Amino acid sequence: MVIADLRLEYSSNVGFASDQGGRGFQHPSHMAMRSDKRIFVASRGVGPTVGIQMVSRDFEFFGKIGSQGTSVGQMMEPSAIAFDSDENMYVADEKLDRVTRFDYEGQVIDAWGVSGKGLGELRRPTGLLIIDDVVYVSDALNHRIQRYYTDGRFIDQFNSTKTIESQLRYPWGITSGLDRDLYVADWGNDRIVRFDLNGNLMSVLSKGLGAELPLNRPADVAVDPDGNIYVADWGNQVLQIFDQNDKFLYMSRGEADLNQWALEYFEAQQDEKQARSSYVPVYETDTEDVREVSARIEPYFWDPCSVMVDADSRVYVLETCRHRFQIFERI
């Protein structure tokens, strides 16, 4: 569905359900791209699959940072990734209520965070953003955004103390645009909220496709250089794009095919390859549950949880339940 001049063309997808670790992801939750275009994916399955997987859009696999556990440098449920001006990596963990800092080589520097409801304390941190070496954290169960210095010293917070319109409910992904404003995926309120860097409300964007398909539990948000807003619309199982005036531009359900990693797997598993090649899928549409439809149709997004736009205007959408991200070119 296209309005105006913005359209996306499917390019490829990267990912593989990795149950035993190694190349691939397991229930990924977030992704971020470093300046060298290496892509970091938070994988949060069990055992050897937990950590930050490093890949490229060309199917290179560079290894993993972190392991499952509670010690400094380990993770349980990594939920968000961000980089500071020195390209240190920060990883939020919503199980441990902390943020861990790693250097460029992936060596742990420190970790900070205390569970609780007080100022500076965290309950399910789900989003990270770093601007001018100030760390913004979506503190989901406390329904607020908190700000810290990069060493974890608390600065301040903003949430529902100003106006009803600016109240957050389970904020999730957070990003910024060229305007240096903050864009928050306000998951529980089905909208995107825009603040300035000090937490002053600028605008509320919530219509999506309007009455036909309003936003439903948005998980993440990205902004391109033109100011267009990309939403991983988790509840509707789609990517929605609209402009800063809340005008709908484009929607995609996903178009994935078998990627290089999957094809290599089937080459090594000839029985599965033969069975798949002779199988003609019949998609039953006897349900209106969009998540169930996504589960049945392999090209579709299944729980889109993270979205980003790179410097070349490529759009990346990460899916939790299909353990992959789809890549689109803007045309």
Stretches found by the model and what they are:
Residues 1-331:
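Eukaryotic scaffold repeat domains enriched in small/polar residues
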